[in-house]
């Protein structure tokens, strides 16, 4: 029998690049999504840092009253932010080359659009990269599905809401106090606390925190001891070991007696699916709620819904919230409005000349 050996031609430069990009042996997986993710996230991060430190004030409301957001213009870490693009720009695509000068671009808040659009592309590619690495390793795709919740939330406040409101100036500022301002104004204009999708998001985040703490504490309390009393129980675990590291039967028995039997999972896979799904679904709903309120489909309005037999209003908590909303609304962008629409009279008074 004769074997014929044929020398394999060396792969082309492109072929070697493809192999390197898709290799799961790299210390950090790159992937085709990573080819776009890396430059977009690096750009967003670099511009954010520079603008947070040194960007000049931005005319956010388009009324020639610039708002300072950077450290060099008097802010600290708490009050500083990347100020959203000016209302004078609206939803226009506003790259540097569309402005007459860099000074004009900075004055109109160009860095905000640059950061937000690169950031959204980057996190979407990060999600795609999670799926891609899972696919290469033969894993199921649910890591990327879970990450879609924060991606949807970011897209809602940075892109969908500005589109619905007609201007990037209504997007969430990139800073701590700016985020709080966004939340307060959002409540004033959309009554988000009375929106059922926001309520589901609160249940998702707080419930997820509770379930995570419950699960972690139950597992930690039911470890199978492999060490002496003089050593930490954590030292008894060896990475990659085949044996269970905790006694799920003991944990199930404890929790079943603490609450009731069927409140406790007896299937580890069902348990971990629940731990992932609860906060993810909640945040999906919140992102959907923001996206609907972007187009002014707002939270429930139960104002003055309880009256006595004489027709006099009996205030409920809904009326208290409404009063707070009106107070917040008259205070924000105080120089941009002659009079808030919500407080304007339905009918103009007649004037007899």
Swiss-Prot record:
Cited Pfam families: Photo_RC
Keyword line: Acetylation, Calcium, Chlorophyll, Chloroplast, Chromophore, Electron transport, Herbicide resistance, Iron, Magnesium, Manganese, Membrane, Metal-binding, Oxidoreductase, Phosphoprotein, Photosynthesis, Photosystem II, Plastid, Thylakoid, Transmembrane, Transmembrane helix, Transport
Positions that bind [CaMn4O5] cluster: 170, 189, 332-333, 342, 344
Residues binding pheophytin a: 126
Modified residues (Phosphothreonine): 2
Record GO biological process: photosynthetic electron transport in photosystem II; response to herbicide
Location (main, coarse): plastid
GO molecular function, one term: electron transporter, transferring electrons within the cyclic electron transport pathway of photosynthesis activity
Cofactor descriptive note: The D1/D2 heterodimer binds P680, chlorophylls that are the primary electron donor of PSII, and subsequent electron acceptors. It shares a non-heme iron and each subunit binds pheophytin, quinone, additional chlorophylls, carotenoids and lipids. D1 provides most of the ligands for the Mn4-Ca-O5 cluster of the oxygen-evolving complex (OEC). There is also a Cl(-1) ion associated with D1 and D2, which is required for oxygen evolution. The PSII complex binds additional chlorophylls, carotenoids and specific lipids.
Site (Tyrosine radical intermediate): 161
Catalysis performed (reactions): 2 a plastoquinone + 4 hnu + 2 H2O = 2 a plastoquinol + O2
Binding positions (chlorophyll a ChlzD1): 118
Recorded superkingdom: Eukaryota
NCBIfam families, A to Z: psbA (TIGR01151)
Family affiliation: Belongs to the reaction center PufL/M/PsbA/D family.
Protein name, UniProt field: Photosystem II protein D1
Gene encoding the protein: psbA
